[in-house]
Amino acid sequence: VHLTNEEKTAVIGLWGKVNVEEVGGEALGRLLVVYPWTQRFFESFGDLSSPSAIMGNPKVKAHGKKVLNSFSEGLKNLDNLKGTFAKLSELHCDKLHVDPENFRLLGYILLCVLARHFGKEFTPQVQAAYQKVVAGVATALAHKYH
């Protein structure tokens, strides 16, 4: 992902304020509510019968945190996203058979959640920088599919 120094500063600066547990749980929960077909990958998580059940599900929250911790690793390695996410790409492709489009959808959801949490701080410029990052991460996660 090519980011200007200004964009890198904006992305890293905002990320330092992110509560990965809260934002991760909300992002994954919203993915499962907004795009219900993604729930099939999480059948072992128990009750996903309603939006409130999904958003309150401790396994959804825990996995959302795990997802954002991986995203944090990507932010530390913006120049090597494919390498950073190679094993996760292989897992999601070969073992879990996740449609790579879901990575893009989660990226869009993450942008919505960041905007909700950070309001005016999530300026159009910050959003543009994050859009590049989530697109790069989605591409890296889809790499093993090609």
UniProtKB/Swiss-Prot annotation:
Key words, A-Z: Acetylation, Heme, Iron, Metal-binding, Oxygen transport, Phosphoprotein, S-nitrosylation, Transport
Phosphoserine carried by residues: 44
Name any Gene Ontology BP term: hydrogen peroxide catabolic process
Task: Tell me which InterPro entries the record gives.
Answer: Globin (IPR000971), Globin-like_sf (IPR009050), Globin/Proto (IPR012292), Hemoglobin_b (IPR002337), Hemoglobin_oxygen_transport (IPR050056)
Binding of heme b occurs at 63, 92
Name positions with the PTM S-nitrosocysteine: 93
Give coiled-coil spans as residue ranges.
Answer: none
In this chain the Globin domain maps to: 2-146
According to UniProt, the tissues expressing it are described as: Red blood cells.
Q: Name one GO cellular component term.
A: blood microparticle
Give residues where N6-acetyllysine occurs: 59, 82, 144
Q: Which CDD domains match?
A: Hb-beta-like (cd08925)
Give the function comment from the record. Involved in oxygen transport from the lung to the various peripheral tissues.
Hey, which family's this protein in?
Belongs to the globin family.
Subunit field text? Heterotetramer of two alpha chains and two beta chains.
Protein name, entry field = Hemoglobin subunit beta
Organism encoding this protein: Lyroderma lyra (Greater Asian false-vampire bat)
Source taxonomy:
Eukaryota, Metazoa, Chordata, Craniata, Vertebrata
